[in-house]
Amino acid sequence: MKENVLDVLMYLFQNYMDSEVESQPTKESLEVELTEAGFHHAEIGKAFDWLEGLALLQQSEPRRFPVTNSSIRIFTLHEKEKLDTECRGFLLFLEQVGVLDSMTRELIIDRVMALEAEDFDLEHLKWVILMVLSHQPGQEAAYAWMEDLVFDEVSDLLH
């Protein structure tokens, strides 16, 4: 099984983060379950690090930059290597329609860049966006919109 950190994160998201379970499992019990599901210890550790990084970024004091409607995000060469034109266009679209604000966009880009995935595509980006929005207070409508988009596409693939 060729899995990466994103596969572990998607597994956790689908089974735990998106559920209304009252008692959350411990990190140790999750590690055991993920190992039994076939994930490698190294990838499990990296996934937990990724989630801890997300939590730290969300707890830190947000830096507010003056942003106008005519502002354009310039991507670095490294970001362009990870996020192809389709991914960058999708982020721009989400920002233009009001699903993302500039702070959330930057948080998403940071979390994408923290992944070691070599073949990162639009479907992966949608999952990262969904995971980030699920942890953002006040982003319930944006999360619901992305959840519909991601899970409608998944169910279309299954039928």
Curated annotation (Swiss-Prot):
InterPro entries the record matches: Smg
Pfam families registered for this protein in UniProt: DUF494
Signal sequence bounds: none
Family indicated by similarity: Belongs to the Smg family.
Entry-linked HAMAP family: Smg
PANTHER family, per the entry: PROTEIN SMG
NCBIfam families listed in its UniProt record: PRK03430.1
Name of the protein in question: Protein Smg homolog
Species, as recorded: Nitrosococcus oceani (strain ATCC 19707 / BCRC 17464 / JCM 30415 / NCIMB 11848 / C-107)
Gene symbol of the encoding locus: smg
